[in-house]
């Protein structure tokens, strides 16, 4: 007997690890594959975006592999029981709103600066400590590399 059915939006490696952990805790798991090739084959039923309503109806609670999902999908999932909740996901999916919230709550993060145009880049890099900066998009951009800061001639690393 299971404790209920968890729906995970996503079919990648993080969903695989989450689903395996949920199974060990006694939950059944269903997956909604958004845009990746499923690596969760054999772990539970797999649905696709055109089956969103059917997926949601089959689940007792919903969680996500990543926060950058279409608003309409998140809103529908919120009606079932979405964790983290819709507002948290919207705040967390964009790096600038995420960092601003953490700053407002006095939760330490790495130094950061929002750059919205090439003209702002030099000042932003100059305001950050060290000789390297990690430039990322505010949405997505998980693999932004550490780039040498051309404006930091004498800064310690």
Predicted regions and their residues:
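Solvent-exposed alpha-helices and their adjacent loops that cap or buttress functional pockets
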Residues: 1, 55, 126-128, 138-141
């Amino acid at each position: 007997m299971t404790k209920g059915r968890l729906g995970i939006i996503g079919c990648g490696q993080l969903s695989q690890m989450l689903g395996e952990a949920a199974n060990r805790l006694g939950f059944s798991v269903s997956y909604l594959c958004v845009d990746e090739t499923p690596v969760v084959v054999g772990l539970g039923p797999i649905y696709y975006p055109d089956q969103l309503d059917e997926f949601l109806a089959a689940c007792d609670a919903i969680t996500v592999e990543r926060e950058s999902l279409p608003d309409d999908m998140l809103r529908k999932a919120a009606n079932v029981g979405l964790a983290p909740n819709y507002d948290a996901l919207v705040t967390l999916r964009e790096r600038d709103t995420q960092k601003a919230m953490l700053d407002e709550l006095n939760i330490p993060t790495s130094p950061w600066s929002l750059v919205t145009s090439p003209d702002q880049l030099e000042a932003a890099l100059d305001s950050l400590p060290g000789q390297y900066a990690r430039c990322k998009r505010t949405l997505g951009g998980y693999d932004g590399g550490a780039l040498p800061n051309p404006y930091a001639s004498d800064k310690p690393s």
